[in-house]
Amino acid sequence: MRTGTIEVVAHHVLVLNSVTRSLPFPVTTSDTVKEKFPEEIRLRFRVLDLRRPQMQSNLRLRHNVVKLIRRYLEDEHEFVEIETPVLSKSTPEGARDYLVPSRVQPGTFYALPQSPQLFKQMLMVSGFEKYYQIARCFRDEDLRADRQPEFTQLDMEVAFTSMEDMLKLNEDLMRHVFQAVGDIKLPNPFPRLTYAEAMDRYGTDRPDLRFDWELKDVSDVFLGSSFKVFADTLESGGVIKALCVPGGATVFSNTDLKKGTVYTEASKAGAKGLPFLKVMENGELEGIGPLLSSLKPEKKDQLMELLDTKTGDLILFALGEQSSANQILGRLRLFIAHKLEVIDTSAHSVLWVTDFPMFQWNSDEQRYEALHHPFTAPNPEDMDDLPSARALAYDMIYNGVEIGGGSLRIYKSDVQQRIFEIIGISPEQAEEKFGYLLECFDMGAPPHGGIAYGLDRLVMLLAGESSIRDVIAFPKTTTAQCALTKAPSAVEPQQLKDLAFPKPTS
């Protein structure tokens, strides 16, 4: 035994197989491979990498999470697991599809599902009141640490449900999972923020509440200001937002703020400049000259009281349209918090974000597009002004990461047609792409709602990893390739001929 409490004396040893080539890295219980060997090597020799204690633990954790979910939904709430098609129809309004050519219907294509969205809604019309699935999904999009071209969702849908019922069901589920696998006690109930509150206070719809820095609107402080940049912004209908960074004045130099790391991060979010002030001894301020000189004593006191500043604090400003100012400071809030290591990594922050806008304006295409997806139900109070409507949507946020998102759904064909028209899908296009769904809605569809969790991302967070590749047995690289099998690869000419594809040119 590993403990040494039992010793086995062997009389005969039979070698079942031999290692006939040198190993690219050692596999030991000390598990230092991840630090010493690049990920490309570990993915190329994944069968060895999976022997490591860390990977064994991660994949067994994944198994336990799925097992807990299945047992809870089936045993406690009588959900039915139903598989939906993998070969389906390409539809607009989403990421790029993976397409599969049909041999028996030349010139036509299946699409691999980005989610089981439409099929699970049709299951609600079919009389299955509680559906779930551990679903494989596919999206042809640019990759990053928490995205893969193929990924796994916990997918759920419930008929005759309310938003409150959906939130409670999912809070109970997550409390059960987190407690069982990590002895983590999540609050009851989960805190909630509306989309507008989250954006206004934290600059993001995925706020990390493990630290309490908040954005403040300081526009009133600078009304009538002689600082031209601020005055012009307010005159044109913009806002001035501020973020107070405790202790930031002693950490970041003026160079950091004018052209260094902090300024660079702000510019990535669209900032054209980064006005700042530092709170020095006796409440004196230092910073941008014209900004300082524009602050009369009573305005300075008003600003410092509003931000509750202390000696050594740093005040950062963003200006312009409210959405852009929020975005700039929201990005800086997270960047600086990581830089200063103020986030309590042992804490667990979970909340719901609700009341999302139904639509966002796509300035490139000059049209509205669905913020979530076009099957989300609008708030009944906003039916008279759908372009500005709030959605009956809800996202679950854990430590600043969206782990699940859902909504109540549209279940009447006339409402669905109106939503399609707003996002630029004509009645003819709607019939061609979604006629089968609209037909179902006309057969007595019940009210329904659902949610989907990114299972890979959820397990990644529970495992304390920074990449979902560390909780997937055989993941793709950031170039959407399998380092082990070399997929995707060229195929035989006859295979292309069978599909009526032209031969590839050399």
Predicted regions and their residues:
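Class II aminoacyl-tRNA synthetase catalytic cores and aaRS-like
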Residues: 1-506
